[in-house]
């Protein structure tokens, strides 16, 4: 005798309950909100600061090669480099020294549109300086790289390991043989 099992499925329905929501009637009148307004007869309330700006002339970009951040400025001194490195350390970025022997600037090798290998990838000098707390450590690595490769362009980058992005990059050294034209 074979035993058989019967299964029955019962569908239970419940009546849909209608929820009463009032239709949107627009914004309320502004008369119900207390607002104090300042009279616009005062010159200091104008948003433009045109009268207080002292303009600074930029480094001329004509005939200059485009490098990285700060590329149109004059070369940075050791003190200015140390300040930039201190800035990236304050932001908790990892400093890294990189060098390029042939092209220290953006160039187009594989067509006229930006491509994968068009002057954007440099050789890393040693490993990134994880745990670095002093700009002197980074500048020491730049000096070592200069001694090893005196004809190379050297740059310092700041890498944010939380967001996995490069946040800053600037030229630390241009070879003496380099001409701008």
From Swiss-Prot:
Its main location: plastid. GO terms for biological process: photorespiration; reductive pentose-phosphate cycle. The keyword Lipoprotein does not apply. SUPFAM superfamilies: RuBisCO, small subunit. GO terms for cellular component: apoplast; chloroplast; chloroplast envelope; chloroplast stroma; cytosolic ribosome; plastid; thylakoid. Keywords: Calvin cycle, Carbon dioxide fixation, Chloroplast, Photorespiration, Photosynthesis, Plastid, Transit peptide. InterPro entries: RuBisCO_ssu, RuBisCO_ssu_dom, RuBisCO_ssu_N, RuBisCO_ssu_sf. GO terms for molecular function: mRNA binding; protein domain specific binding; ribulose-bisphosphate carboxylase activity. It is found in: Plastid, Chloroplast. It comes from the Eukaryota. Residues 1-54 form a transit peptide. Belongs to the RuBisCO small chain family. RuBisCO catalyzes two reactions: the carboxylation of D-ribulose 1,5-bisphosphate, the primary event in carbon dioxide fixation, as well as the oxidative fragmentation of the pentose substrate. Both reactions occur simultaneously and in competition at the same active site. Although the small subunit is not catalytic it is essential for maximal activity. Heterohexadecamer of 8 large and 8 small subunits. HAMAP family: RuBisCO_S_bact (MF_00859). There are four genes coding for RBS in Arabidopsis thaliana. The basic functional RuBisCO is composed of a large chain homodimer in a 'head-to-tail' conformation. In form I RuBisCO this homodimer is arranged in a barrel-like tetramer with the small subunits forming a tetrameric 'cap' on each end of the 'barrel'. This is Ribulose bisphosphate carboxylase small subunit 2B, chloroplastic. The gene is RBCS-2B.
